[in-house]
Amino acid sequence: MVNVLTLADVSGEGRFAGCTLGVDSQSDKWWGEGDNMVWLDDTNSPALHGTGTEDYFGFAWCSVDIFNHPFRGQTMVANTPHHTIANMHRYHLLDTLPFQKWGRFQFGALGNGMGKMDWSTSVMWYSMNH
């Protein structure tokens, strides 16, 4: 079974400008690797399809390093053998993702089969509805 976390599903004209993601995983397994997918308008496949959660936010290989760059970062990690809490962000200020009719922002297969996981998200977008 594949889990999908939908961060935003909006109608009308607009632009995605960024998101934050927080995870509270009560497992000793890596919580990431869910592909990020941005669906725009009437596409049959994602307009943006990434390779993994950590890649989208600017790090790799299950890193617990804290960093904060102008457009992406992992600003908090608390890691014990059976529990991880992490917060990250990415801003599309120079590469917004425009849509005319609707847009959907998702991460797929997050923590698939790993037990209890809590997620917190926020998505920033500009609405162009007239």
Label each residue range with its predicted role:
Residues 1-130:
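Beta-strand-centric surfaces of beta-sandwich/beta-rich domains
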